[in-house]
Amino acid sequence: MTDDILKKYLKEIPAFLALLRAVEAGFYREIELPDPMLDLGCGDGRFGTLALQHPIRAGIDNEWRVVQEANKRTAYLTVAQGQGARLPFANEYFASAVSNSVLEHIPDIDPALRDLSRVLQSGATFAFCVPSEHFLSFLSVSRVLRRIGLSALARRYETFFNYISRHHHCDSPETWQHRLDIAGFDVERYWYYFSPRALQALEWGHYLGVPALLAKAITRRWIVAPSDANLWLTDKIVRRYFELPLPT
């Protein structure tokens, strides 16, 4: 696919989220994900619609409201409400699965991984994105606080930012590999995909994105005027972070 995924996202969601989702989408497009595929934690279905090949056999999420939104999209053959640890699917049904920025939000992650393993065929591909162990240490505010000797305040800020991000896990590849091994998965490869500069843009986007939150509450749309002309400056600012090389 050669379409401009960043531009598509900027027309639908706040810029800081558009940056993250567009970067993530590029990786899934390079991975072979045979049918039938499961989207674990599909949310409102926007990511599956914009980033994945259609049709997607099934999506599942634990929030009824977003399941209803996902059902309105044409990308999924079926969307179900359910918990990750009790997936309503037969053993060894899916040939692949994705879970984009979802696993970090599940407090008790091990049962969810075990049940996902149950519904996947032998040798099935499971691709997912999660924040790494560097997520908190890369934040600009906590970096400044530590630089001036306010380490305790930096830790409080990191706790606050993790809270508003609803994260339960910001872990290293080694920690994830241990979890996946126990659940029956073999890790083929992993990589870091968001640079410190991009993460700091994401960080400040949380605060600068408040007007979009108000727009969503009033109009039910994140972006009220999604024209190229209206988003020209936003695109120019965000694209410099989108095009950054992968961190080492």
List the model feature ranges, each with a label.
Residues 1-86, 90, 96-98, 113, ...:
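Conserved N-terminal segment of class I S-adenosyl-L-methionine
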Residues 88, 93, 105, 184:
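Conserved functional loop/turn residues at catalytic and ligand-binding sites
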Residues 86, 104, 133:
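Active-site micro-motifs of SAM-dependent methyltransferase domains
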Residues 107-115, 125-248:
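S-adenosyl-L-methionine-dependent methyltransferase catalytic module, highlighting the catalytic core
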Residues 98-107:
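A short SAM/SAH-binding and catalytic strip from SAM-dependent methyltransferases
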